[in-house]
């Protein structure tokens, strides 16, 4: 099975003709036979030379080139070839056969002449495309931000609205209007700029980053203040008198509230437009400033409010965690006699109680009361232990601890002490076994 037969291969003449038609060429070389014949004749063909001159002039009008191809060199072929060679070198022609070798032998072949036409026509096509893109970028949409800014300048300066959206042309009108206005005012009317240096691209980018960081910080602060404003105004409507006027408050407050924006409006343009008078510091409490900042709310006086205290010099110190230390006093409790009472207690505590009938109980120690009496059938109750108080025949009392009641023992009927509890000792008794 045979596939489709391949079509005719594209030729260089066909590429040149297609490019010339796209460029809008209206000369005599739009036919393939005429183009081939002119390429074979080279620079000696007037049609070929005219086409080269037309392509070179179109390229020069779109590009900033020093070299050019003019009609003045057609009479002298060597000069004409020098112009073409210099033009191709400035255009960075990739065909070495057109820019190197003996200049008299460069355009003698048909293929070399077609390469020259193809290079010039394609370069012209590329230049037209780039120029068209630049023109489209300058013809901005009338709804774009840049166009709105330029139109705002037109309104401020009193320039009639432009029918075109060509930004460079509109900026030229603004510049001429500003120069005309400045020529009619005093020399120092505008003042010297605060920023006296010219910024390069790197410095401008750095200032943009600084402005972005500050804008984020101020946006956070503005949002906080706006939220506080909302909460404050909302709290005014809590009273019964204000609840009936909710609609009136909203009608007055909402338009002013929506006019506040959390986004900052300071840009690089404000920095460039700042003048030296902006750096002057003026006190906000000066007389001239207060004339413009005074309002009726400054005359509203607050009533008397209760004193909430909280001053450091009025705060009382906390109470001590332990009692103050005092020196021990001399003197302690004595021992009781036969049937006698107990001795007096030491400093800070109660005295020990006397035992009944037997050899008496001992006195208490530091703050502690000793107890316990011996004798026939007499059982003394234990005393309360004070601060490290010690009974006579008993155990040691703890810190504020309480001595236990002694148990009855079995022993000597003449006052033998039984096993006591924590505080006072137990009394022995005359008991029957």
UniProtKB/Swiss-Prot annotation:
Q: Where does this protein have compositionally biased stretches of type Basic and acidic residues? A: 305-314
Principal location listed in the UniProt entry:
nucleus
Q: Where in the cell is it found?
A: Nucleus; Cytoplasm
Per UniProt, which keywords does this protein have? Cytoplasm, Nucleus
Please provide, alphabetically and separated by semicolons, the GO molecular function terms listed in this UniProt record: identical protein binding; protein methyltransferase activity; RNA binding
Q: Which domain of life is it from?
A: Eukaryota
Keyword NADP part of the UniProt annotation: no
Amino acid composition bias (Gly residues), ranges on this chain: 331-433
Q: What is this protein's tissue specificity according to the annotation?
A: Expressed strongly in colorectal cancer tissues compared to wild-type colon samples (at protein level). Expressed strongly in colorectal cancer tissues compared to wild-type colon samples.
InterPro entries reported for this sequence = FAM98
Region named Disordered: 303-433
Example GO CC term: the record gives: tRNA-splicing ligase complex
A biological process term (GO) from this entry: positive regulation of gene expression
Per the record, the similarity remark reads:
Belongs to the FAM98 family.
Described by its record, this protein's role is as follows: Positively stimulates PRMT1-induced protein arginine dimethylated arginine methylation.
Subunit structure, as described in the record: Homodimer. Component of the tRNA-splicing ligase complex. Interacts with FAM98A.
The name under which this protein is listed is Protein FAM98B
User: What is the source species?
Assistant: Homo sapiens (Human)
Highest lineage ranks of the organism? Eukaryota, Metazoa, Chordata, Craniata, Vertebrata
């Amino acid at each position: 099975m045979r596939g489709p037969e391949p079509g005719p291969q594209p030729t260089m003449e066909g590429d040149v003709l297609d490019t010339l038609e796209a460029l809008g060429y209206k000369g005599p070389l739009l036919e393939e036979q005429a183009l081939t014949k002119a390429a074979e004749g080279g620079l000696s063909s007037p049609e070929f030379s005219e086409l080269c001159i037309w392509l070179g002039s179109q390229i020069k009008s779109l590009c900033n080139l020093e070299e050019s191809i003019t009609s003045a060199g057609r009479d002298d072929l060597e000069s004409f070839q020098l112009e073409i060679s210099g033009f191709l070198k400035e255009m960075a022609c990739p065909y070495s056969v057109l820019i190197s070798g003996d200049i008299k032998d460069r355009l003698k072949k048909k293929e070399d002449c077609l390469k020259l036409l193809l290079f010039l026509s394609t370069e012209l096509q590329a230049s037209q495309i780039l120029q068209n893109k630049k023109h489209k970028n300058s013809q901005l949409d009338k709804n774009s931000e840049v166009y709105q800014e330029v139109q705002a300048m037109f309104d401020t300066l009193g320039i009639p609205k432009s029918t075109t959206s060509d930004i460079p042309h509109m900026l030229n009108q603004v510049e001429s209007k500003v120069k005309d206005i400045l020529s009619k005012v005093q020399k120092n009317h505008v003042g010297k700029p605060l920023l006296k240096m010219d910024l390069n691209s790197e410095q401008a980018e750095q200032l943009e980053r600084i402005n972005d960081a500050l804008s984020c910080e101020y946006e956070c602060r503005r949002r906080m203040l706006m939220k506080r404003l909302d909460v404050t105004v909302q709290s005014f409507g809590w009273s019964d008198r204000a609840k009936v006027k909710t609609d009136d408050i909203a009608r007055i407050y909402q338009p002013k509230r929506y006019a506040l924006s959390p986004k900052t409006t300071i840009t690089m343009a404000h920095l460039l437009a700042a003048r030296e008078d902006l750096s002057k510091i003026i006190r906000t409490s000066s007389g001239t400033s207060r004339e413009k900042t005074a309002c009726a709310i400054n005359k509203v006086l607050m009533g008397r409010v209760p004193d909430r205290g909280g001053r450091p010099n009025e705060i009382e110190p906390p109470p001590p965690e332990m009692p103050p230390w005092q020196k021990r006093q001399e003197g302690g409790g004595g021992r009781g006699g036969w049937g006698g009472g107990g001795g007096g207690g030491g400093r800070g505590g109660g005295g020990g109680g006397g035992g009944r009938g037997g050899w008496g109980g001992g006195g208490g120690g530091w703050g502690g009361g000793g107890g316990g009496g011996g004798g026939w059938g007499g059982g003394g109750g234990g005393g309360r232990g004070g601060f490290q108080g010690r009974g006579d025949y008993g155990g040691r009392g703890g810190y504020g601890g309480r001595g236990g009641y002694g148990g009855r023992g079995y022993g000597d009927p003449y006052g033998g002490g039984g096993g006591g509890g924590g505080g006072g000792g137990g009394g022995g008794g005359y008991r029957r076994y």
